[in-house]
Amino acid sequence: MTEELKLMGANRRDQLLLWLKESKSPLTGGELAKKANVSRQVIVQDISLLKAKNVPIIATSQGYVYMDAAAQQHQQAERIIACLHGPERTEEELQLIVDEGVTVKDVKIEHPVYGDLTAAIQVGTRKEVSHFIKKINSTNAAYLSQLTDGVHLHTLTAPDEHRIDQACQALEEAGILIKD
């Protein structure tokens, strides 16, 4: 990496923000690092600094995404649901949800020491579900729900409540949804 080709400090963060805003799909830390001619760790630090300034960037399993107000308003209905299943049913669970036109925004567990732990998922298609599952498997990462014997919450978003109702019905029929 030559010094004159590197993007520096605030200029680099401005450029990262521009790339994320212009991108139609998530950008990985590695992709951003290559574009900026810096290490992935520098990108992680830059993203943290941008988030600290309340820039709406989320980290998903596919990479970083800029969530502008228009994108957030596009998904108008939102609901938190409780689920219970083992790790072997995660792909089935996510597919049942996205098949109804619903996006799984995140997963949340209640940890006995740390309290609520939330991780962004942001999957809305079978392709994104497949990518998420492959990434979990290739990194040997554990699902958060494994820390709570399969109990977890998901925040679901969709253009309307009916789609979320349909996804919940599919999860209930599969024995995954925890009802009140």
Curated annotation (Swiss-Prot):
Pfam families: 3H, HTH_11. The keyword Transcription regulation applies. The keyword Transferase does not apply. InterPro entries: 3H_dom_sf, 3H_domain, HTH_11, NadR, WH-like_DNA-bd_sf, WH_DNA-bd_sf. One of its GO terms (molecular function) is small molecule binding. It comes from the Bacteria. Disruption phenotype: No visible phenotype when grown in the absence of nicotinic acid. Keywords: DNA-binding, Repressor, Transcription, Transcription regulation. Homodimer. In the presence of nicotinic acid represses transcription of the nadBCA and nifS-nadR operons. Also binds to DNA upstream of the niaP gene, probably regulating it as well. May bind nicotinic acid. This is Transcription repressor NadR.
